[in-house]
Structures are given as C-alpha cells and as structure tokens.
C-alpha cells in the first residue's frame, strides 16, 4: 500500500487582500508552500507527492521543486476553479491505483507536523477516510440564512474544527464524487463532506490535529504563523 501526499495550492487567496497568492508568501525564509511540502517530503511514510496549482504557476512551482531537490514530487498538476476540482485532478491521476492512500493537505497550513501525518497514515489502516480535527473550544450557534438571529446552540462537546490533511483510499474518494455528480444539487465544501453525504456507509475517522496547524486565510495570520514558527513546539 502506497501513500501519496497531495498538496492543494491552486487557490487565489483573495481573502488575504494581497496581490500574491498566499501559498507563495514568504514565511521564515521560505514560501508558505515550501513549508507544507517539505514536511510531507521529509516524512518516511510518504511515498510520493503531487502538487496541484493554478495553471499560471506551474512553471514557478516546478522551479521550486527543482531548487529543493524534492524527488518525491511526481507531478505538478493544474488545479480547477473550485477546491474539489483540484482534488479530483489528483484523484484521477491515481485511477489505476484504487488502494492508494491519498492525504490531501492545504498548502496554506504550513505548520502541519510530522506527528499529524504519522497519525493520519496509521488511522488509514482502520478507516477508508479520515479527517484531522481539533475539539471546538468556543460555543457554536446556528443562525438564520442571513445571520440576523440565532436559531439554536450546538452541543460543543460533539463539535470539532476541521483541519487537513484529509485522507482517503483512492477508490473511496473517486466513488464519492461519482455519486455526487449524479446529484443536480451537489455543492462541495470539502472532500470529507462529499464522502459523508454520498457514501453514508463509510465511516470517516478523526485524527487529532493541533492548534498550531492553522490555515493562512487573512493577512494578519502571517504574523501569528511567524510567531508559531519561531516558538518552541
């Protein structure tokens, strides 16, 4: 059984308000993308890597791969308009390897740890799909569609905040999307959500993440990431 790390780096990062896509922003002397890829590349349990990027940045990423000597990177693939489009590009690239374990990771989570990747790989021995997550610490409320008023308060003890990587056997995530595309009302939020909805018989295991494994979403997050990068683990 081989394990493939899929680094999703095709987003525009518009919410940062910066002209440079967030995965190419500098962080501790490297780009955000380099931090994410390097951790996966260094992990002994990762056999291959695929990086999915916007087509306009393929040459740039191929140059980064060469500069870093990342010999586990087998392909730099063009991403799609939506996140699930980018996931599918990688899924279809391994169509001939249905039992391959695929770990999908947001490039914008540069502080993913070796421990998280190890635990995700181990969890895939028990489950056909997993998600990295951490317990919710704030009370979560449900509101009306306009966000005007509360409609209910959720039981915090049952709620977890999703992170990445998310892991699947290739055949499972491919089947989930095949079923989803039969639904004219299909709208994808993430890969695990697609499995939960369209393959209800598949249990999605939980792997405990880390508060350090934050996603770069807004420009202010860069300062926090710089601090966490320099702070003792």
Regions found by a protein language model. Give the residues of each.
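Conserved alpha/beta core of the MobA/IspD/sugar-nucleotide pyrophosphorylase nucleotidyltransferase superfamily
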Residues: 161-233
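Residue-level signal for inorganic ion chemistry
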Residues: 7, 33, 90, 105-106, ...
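N-terminal glycine-rich phosphate-binding loop and ensuing alpha1 helix
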Residues: 1-59
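Residues at the starts of beta-strands that form the adenosine-phosphate
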Residues: 47-49, 128-129, 203
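Conserved beta-loop-beta/alpha segment of the NTase-like Rossmann-fold superfamily
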Residues: 75, 81-143, 163
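Conserved N-terminal catalytic core of the sugar/cofactor nucleotidyltransferase
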Residues: 34-99, 183-184
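Short, flexible, basic/aromatic active-site loop/helix in glycosyltransferases
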Residues: 142-164, 168
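Hydrophobic packing residues within well-ordered alpha-helices of enzyme cores
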Residues: 16, 61-65, 120, 173, ...
């Amino acid at each position: 059984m081989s394990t493939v790390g899929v680094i999703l780096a095709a987003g525009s990062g518009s919410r940062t308000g910066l002209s440079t896509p967030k995965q190419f922003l500098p962080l501790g002397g490297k780009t955000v993308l380099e931090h994410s890829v390097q951790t996966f590349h260094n992990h002994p349990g990762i056999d291959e890597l695929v990086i999915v990027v916007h087509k306009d940045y393929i040459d740039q990423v191929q140059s980064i791969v060469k500069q870093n000597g990342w010999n586990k990177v087998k392909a730099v693939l063009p991403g799609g308009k939506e996140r699930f489009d980018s996931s599918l590009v990688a899924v279809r690239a391994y169509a001939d390897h249905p039992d391959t374990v695929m770990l999908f990771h947001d490039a914008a989570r540069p502080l993913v740890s070796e421990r998280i990747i190890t635990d995700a790989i181990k969890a895939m021995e028990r489950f056909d799909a997993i998600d990295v997550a951490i317990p919710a610490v704030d009370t979560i409320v449900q509101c009306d569609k306009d966000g005007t008023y509360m409609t209910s308060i959720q039981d915090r003890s049952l709620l977890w905040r999703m992170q990445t990587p998310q892991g699947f056997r290739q055949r499972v995530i491919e089947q989930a999307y095949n079923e989803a595309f039969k639904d004219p009302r299909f709208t994808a939020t993430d890969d695990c959500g697609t499995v939960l909805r369209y393959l209800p018989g598949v249990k999605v295991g939980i792997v405990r993440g880390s508060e350090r494994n934050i996603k770069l979403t807004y420009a202010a997050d860069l300062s926090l990431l710089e601090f966490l990068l320099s702070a003792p683990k």
